[in-house]
């Protein structure tokens, strides 16, 4: 993961090239500044990522107390006259095979995180990658209509030759999904699944062109009066994506 930038540049739209499967450029596309060029809030990103990882925990851990362990129903020896410390059960915590004191029990680790906070964290993570020229757009990764892992990986390496790449492709794009779903260094996500954690743990983010359009157009509700100068389409698109997490 690259070092996150802490600069606070003015919010401006970015123009990036649209790459073709053969490695050439087939035009350009504009990345809205409200999504790809916003100030980075590291404490916010930390809070959102911690909450996301906590929510992924199963929480099914369980231990048995002295009342749940099998056996230990009778008093091991009489109360007085033995010279030993009095004991009431062989399943007390101090005995081998006894119950556990204050052990973990099933619980939920969910943390409530407002949608706007998750959306802002995702914008910050995407902006950091964009400022370091690590957000790319491709028209397609495979030429033709037949899935090809070799062709897709070759095209991907000409764009982002890094250790871990996040590829955002629509679910309907079976060509991309079938070509890359078995590549260990590539993580595939639908536009609606895009989240802060996966952006941060990836070195580069590669959008298929139609997936980028779907991400930015997702849930395009008009901006409210308190939204300030946020780009309505881009901001709500991020919120819509994080809502599914």
From Swiss-Prot:
A biological process from GO: translation
InterPro entries: Ribosomal_uL4, Ribosomal_uL4-like, Ribosomal_uL4_dom_sf
Keywords recorded for this protein, A-Z: Ribonucleoprotein, Ribosomal protein, RNA-binding, rRNA-binding
Biased composition (Basic residues): 72-83
Stored SUPFAM superfamilies: Ribosomal protein L4
GO cellular component, one term: ribosome
Chain positions covered by the region annotation Disordered: 1-28, 56-114, 224-245
Compositional bias annotation for Basic and acidic residues: 59-71
Ranges of biased composition (kind: Polar residues): 1-13
GO molecular function: rRNA binding; structural constituent of ribosome
Subunit structure: Part of the 50S ribosomal subunit.
Annotated function: One of the primary rRNA binding proteins, this protein initially binds near the 5'-end of the 23S rRNA. It is important during the early stages of 50S assembly. It makes multiple contacts with different domains of the 23S rRNA in the assembled 50S subunit and ribosome.
Entry-linked HAMAP family: Ribosomal_uL4_B
Family of this protein: Belongs to the universal ribosomal protein uL4 family.
Name the UniProt record assigns to this protein: Large ribosomal subunit protein uL4
Record organism: Frankia casuarinae (strain DSM 45818 / CECT 9043 / HFP020203 / CcI3)
Phylogenetic classification of the source organism: Bacteria, Bacillati, Actinomycetota, Actinomycetes, Frankiales
Encoding gene, per UniProt annotation: rplD
């Amino acid at each position: 993961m690259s070092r996150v930038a802490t600069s606070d540049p003015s919010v401006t739209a970015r123009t990036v090239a649209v790459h073709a499967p053969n490695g050439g450029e087939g035009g350009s596309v504009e990345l809205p500044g409200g999504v790809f060029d916003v100030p980075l809030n590291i404490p916010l990103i930390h809070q959102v990522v911690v909450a996301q990882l906590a929510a992924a925990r199963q929480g099914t851990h369980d231990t048995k107390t002295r009342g749940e362990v099998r056996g230990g129903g009778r008093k091991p020896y009489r109360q007085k006259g033995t010279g030993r410390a009095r004991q009431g059960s062989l399943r007390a915590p101090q005995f081998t095979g006894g119950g556990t004191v204050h052990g973990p029990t099933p619980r939920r680790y969910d943390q409530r995180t407002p949608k706007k906070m998750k959306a802002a964290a995702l914008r910050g993570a995407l902006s950091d990658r964009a400022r370091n020229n690590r957000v790319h757009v491709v028209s397609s990764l495979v030429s033709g209509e037949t899935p090809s892992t070799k062709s897709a990986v070759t095209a991907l390496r000409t764009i982002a030759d890094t250790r871990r790449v996040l590829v955002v492709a629509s679910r309907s794009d079976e060509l991309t999904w079938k070509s890359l779903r078995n590549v260990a260094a590539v993580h595939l996500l639908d536009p609606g699944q895009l989240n802060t954690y996966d952006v941060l743990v990836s070195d580069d983010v590669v959008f298929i062109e139609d997936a980028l359009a779907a991400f930015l157009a997702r849930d395009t509700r008009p901006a409210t009066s308190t939204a300030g100068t946020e780009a309505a389409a881009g901001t709500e698109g991020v919120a819509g994506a994080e809502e599914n997490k």
